[in-house]
């Protein structure tokens, strides 16, 4: 500290830079509010850091949920001294933003560092709504993950799950019955996405392993993006510059990984065929493909791991689910459950919904931005204003979900979508968001999640590694909601 003080006081350039930074931050702090827009009330701010002092200590979505109890269902949060965001924590206002005025709030506002691996924000999740975004989305939904194309994948998904079960059996034999399922779930999802993108089966593990590594590395350094988003001048820090260089290296790794497939003629029902037919430049093609992995792999596999963790903690729920699966399999002469069976299994679907309610994979979604002057609750909202919907808050509203912090799939078996309570539950459960920016891969994600979970519970009884030591349910928010401590469990074959 003394050395730093000496450096500042005796070097006029350092003194000037430090003073200028402080003065600019204070200037921004006092000039920040738009004179013709009344921002919703929120917690008191501090110069330079805004509300950052309130946002630590626990998961951000939980902090915002608790702040909303004090400051209202619509409040302003200052992330640093220059980035205000309106946080919505109530279903009525959430639907106003996401659905009723979906086109008004359909723009994006992303950290600068993300431009590197999104072709300058020209992918589905990062681009503003418009012809480019619409065309990309239609190509993915109407071709690559169309109902017919997904149905064609069922036989390959069955092979993948049989392979995963065999690997888990061997892992359990080698480790006194203990397994770590997450990486196996991720690799199965990578294989599925690869078939939809390229139209070929990836039996060899090299590409799968390399893609898995690229995704993990990008998630690992995602914290730097949040730092730069909070503090404008953080992008000039050595640590951020180092992160940018590392993301540039990852960009090259991803390009080298995907580029060899671009010269091959893919089947017409693949995402690659669609992208090439649109004459997009190579960067858009590569990173539109990479986005399907980045947003699809961890979301599906992590949600499945969350479900397994809950079922380890709640043996009675696991037993009831297995009874349903076992009964259905015997009635339909199944050795494994098939993808087309998933929507016929009511309790399975209740477990799926309850897992996504408790641990929404993107609890704060991707922040929206007003693409024109609009309104919220009758109040003017200027073009460019950022709005974040706290899906976690919607999912834990005690007026909608009884005992909201308890894992209770039965709540979804009693729902009548025609009465007020049922409609409120249906409207409040938004794990994939809603409106025109709803997750493009929603149906694929739900199918893969249901299929993997059903067969893993059908094949094995899952229990604690040690008696009385329950799985850690602590989470951390990266691109998706991850388990802070990846699941380890003891498995016993059922058949």
From Swiss-Prot:
Matches recorded under InterPro entries: Cyt_P450, Cyt_P450_CS, Cyt_P450_E_grp-I, Cyt_P450_sf
A GO BP entry: isoquinoline alkaloid biosynthetic process
Instruction: Give the enzyme's EC designation.
Output: 1.14.19.64, 1.14.19.68, 1.14.19.73
Q: In which pathway does it act?
A: Alkaloid biosynthesis
Compartment(s): Endoplasmic reticulum membrane
What tissue expression does the UniProt record report for this protein?
Expressed in roots and at lower levels in stems and leaves.
- GO cellular component terms listed in the entry, alphabetical order: endoplasmic reticulum membrane
Segments traversing the membrane: 10-30
Q: Where does heme bind?
A: 439
Q: Which cofactor does it need?
A: heme
Its protein name is Trifunctional (S)-stylopine synthase 2/(S)-nandinine synthase/(S)-canadine synthase
Where is this chain primarily localised?
Answer: endoplasmic reticulum
Functional note:
Methylenedioxy bridge-forming cytochrome P450 involved in the biosynthesis of isoquinoline alkaloids. Converts (S)-cheilanthifoline to (S)-stylopine, (S)-scoulerine to (S)-nandinine and (S)-tetrahydrocolumbamine to (S)-canadine, but only the ring A (2,3-position) of the substrates is converted. Catalyzes an oxidative reaction that does not incorporate oxygen into the product.
Q: List the disulfide bonds.
A: none
Name the membrane topology term: Single-pass membrane protein
Enzyme class of the recorded protein, top EC level: oxidoreductase
Q: Which reaction does it catalyse?
A: (S)-cheilanthifoline + reduced [NADPH--hemoprotein reductase] + O2 = (S)-stylopine + oxidized [NADPH--hemoprotein reductase] + 2 H2O + H(+); (S)-tetrahydrocolumbamine + reduced [NADPH--hemoprotein reductase] + O2 = (S)-canadine + oxidized [NADPH--hemoprotein reductase] + 2 H2O + H(+); (S)-scoulerine + reduced [NADPH--hemoprotein reductase] + O2 = (S)-nandinine + oxidized [NADPH--hemoprotein reductase] + 2 H2O + H(+)
Work out whether the entry's keyword set contains Repeat.
no
Q: Name one GO molecular function term.
A: (S)-stylopine synthase activity
Induction per UniProt is: Up-regulated by methyl jasmonate treatment.
| Organism field | Eschscholzia californica
Q: What family classification does the UniProt entry report for this protein?
A: Belongs to the cytochrome P450 family.
Key words, A-Z: Endoplasmic reticulum, Heme, Iron, Membrane, Metal-binding, Monooxygenase, Oxidoreductase, Transmembrane, Transmembrane helix
């Amino acid at each position: 500290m003394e050395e730093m003080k000496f450096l500042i006081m005796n070097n006029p350039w350092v003194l000037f830079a430090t003073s200028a930074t402080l003065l600019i931050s204070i200037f921004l702090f006092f000039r920040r509010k738009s004179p013709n827009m009344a921002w919703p009330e929120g917690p008191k701010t501090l110069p330079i850091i805004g509300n950052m002092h309130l946002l630590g200590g626990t998961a951000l979505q939980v902090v915002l949920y608790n702040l909303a109890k004090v400051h209202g269902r619509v409040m302003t949060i200052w992330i640093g001294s220059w980035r205000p965001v309106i946080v919505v924590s109530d279903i009525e206002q959430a639907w106003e933003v996401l659905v009723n005025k979906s086109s008004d709030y359909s723009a994006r506002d992303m950290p600068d560092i993300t431009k590197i691996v999104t072709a300058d924000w020209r992918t589905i999740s990062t681009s503003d709504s418009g012809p480019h975004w619409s065309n990309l989305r239609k190509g993915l939904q109407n071709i690559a993950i169309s109902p017919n194309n997904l149905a064609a994948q069922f036989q390959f998904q069955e092979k993948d799950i049989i392979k995963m079960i065999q690997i888990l059996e061997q892992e359990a034999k080698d480790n006194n019955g203990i397994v770590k399922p997450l990486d196996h779930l991720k690799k199965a999802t990578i294989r599925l996405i690869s078939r939809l993108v390229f139209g070929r089966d990836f039996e060899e593990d090299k590409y799968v392993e390399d893609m898995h590594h690229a995704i993990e590395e990008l998630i690992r350094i995602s914290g730097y993006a949040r730092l730069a988003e909070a503090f404008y001048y953080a992008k000039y820090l050595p640590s951020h510059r180092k992160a940018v260089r590392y993301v540039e290296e990852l960009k090259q790794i991803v390009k080298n990984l995907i580029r060899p497939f671009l010269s091959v003629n893919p089947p017409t029902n693949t995402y690659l065929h669609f992208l090439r037919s649109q004459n997009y430049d190579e960067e858009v093609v590569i990173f539109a493909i990479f986005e399907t992995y980045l947003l699809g792999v961890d979301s599906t596999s992590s949600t499945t791991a969350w479900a397994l963790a809950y079922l380890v903690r709640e043996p009675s729920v696991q037993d009831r689910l297995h009874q349903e699966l076992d009964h259905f399999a015997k009635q339909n002469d199944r050795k494994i459950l098939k993808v087309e069976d998933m929507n016929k299994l009511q309790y399975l679907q209740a477990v799926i919904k309850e897992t996504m309610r408790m641990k929404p994979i993107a609890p704060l979604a991707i922040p929206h931005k007003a693409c024109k002057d609009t309104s919220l609750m009758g109040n003017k909202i200027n073009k460019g204003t950022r709005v974040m919907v706290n899906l976690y808050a919607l999912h834990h509203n005690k007026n909608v979900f009884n005992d909201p912090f308890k894992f209770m799939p039965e709540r979804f078996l009693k729902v009548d979508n025609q009465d007020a309570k049922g409609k409120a539950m249906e409207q409040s459960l938004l794990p994939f968001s809603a409106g025109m920016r709803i997750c493009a891969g929603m149906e694929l994600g739900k199918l893969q999640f249901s299929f993997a979970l059903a067969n893993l519970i059908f094949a094995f009884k899952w229990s604690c590694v040690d008696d009385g030591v329950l799985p850690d349910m602590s989470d951390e928010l990266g691109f998706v909601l991850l388990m802070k401590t990846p699941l380890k469990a003891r498995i016993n074959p059922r058949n």
